[in-house]
Every structure is written in C-alpha cells, then in structure tokens.
Amino acid sequence: MASIIYSPKDIFEQDFKVSMRGYDKKEVDVFLDDVIKDYENYLEQIEKLQMENRRLQQALDKKESEASNVRNSGTAMYNQKPIAQSATNFDILKRISRLEKEVFGRQIRE
C-alpha cells in the first residue's frame, strides 16, 4: 500500500511562491480546503475500516477456536463410539444365542 505523503495539516500549512502571472490565490485556497476535507474523510474511513478489520479478525479467531474445539470433541466421540458399538454387538450376540437355544431347543423336543 502506498504511503501518505501529506497530512491535512501539511496541506493546510503549505505556502506557494507568488509570481506576477501565478494562479489565483483564492482559487488555490478553495481547492486546498477541499483537498484537506477529502483527506480528513479518507483518514476517518481508514480508521473505521481498520477497526472493523480488527473486530472481524477477532471474530474469525473466535470461530476458528470454536471449530477446533468441536473437531476435538467430535474426534473424542468418534473414538468412544467403537467401544459402545462393541458392547452393543456383544448384547446382540447374547440375544441371538439365547433365541437360537430356544428355537433349536423346541425343535429337539418336538
């Protein structure tokens, strides 16, 4: 980004050499007044944008931290899931075994 050469104060305090066929001093003053106003507006806009940029960067950092926490807790839950599934599978196998004993036990008796 290009650096700013003049501040509003520098522009205001700038003196021009006067020559016989020089520019109209009032016209130059009016123009420079407008330039100073523009400069002040630009500086104000830059400050607002920098503040917004900082605020958005902080919000982004917060969201990234939250996302990381969610990922970490999701990984922990994923790692715990196989244990719960194996316990469930074991219960299912026990039920199947009990049902087979009942079904095949009835067939043998009949």
Curated annotation (Swiss-Prot):
Keywords (A to Z) from UniProt: Cell cycle, Cell division, Cell shape, Coiled coil, Cytoplasm
Residues in coiled coil: 32-73
Principal location: cytoplasm
Transmembrane segments: none
This protein's GO CC annotations: cytoplasm
Gene3D superfamilies, per database record: 6.10.250.660
InterPro entries per UniProt: Cell_cycle_GpsB (IPR011229), DivIVA_domain (IPR019933), DivIVA_fam (IPR007793)
Pfam families listed in its UniProt record: DivIVA
Gene Ontology BP, a term: cell division
Subcellular location: Cytoplasm
Keyword Coiled coil: yes
Complex and partners: Forms polymers through the coiled coil domains. Interacts with PBP1, MreC and EzrA.
Record HAMAP family: GpsB (MF_02011)
Main function: Divisome component that associates with the complex late in its assembly, after the Z-ring is formed, and is dependent on DivIC and PBP2B for its recruitment to the divisome. Together with EzrA, is a key component of the system that regulates PBP1 localization during cell cycle progression. Its main role could be the removal of PBP1 from the cell pole after pole maturation is completed. Also contributes to the recruitment of PBP1 to the division complex. Not essential for septum formation.
Family that this chain belongs to: Belongs to the GpsB family.
Protein name: Cell cycle protein GpsB
Organism of derivation: Streptococcus agalactiae serotype V (strain ATCC BAA-611 / 2603 V/R)
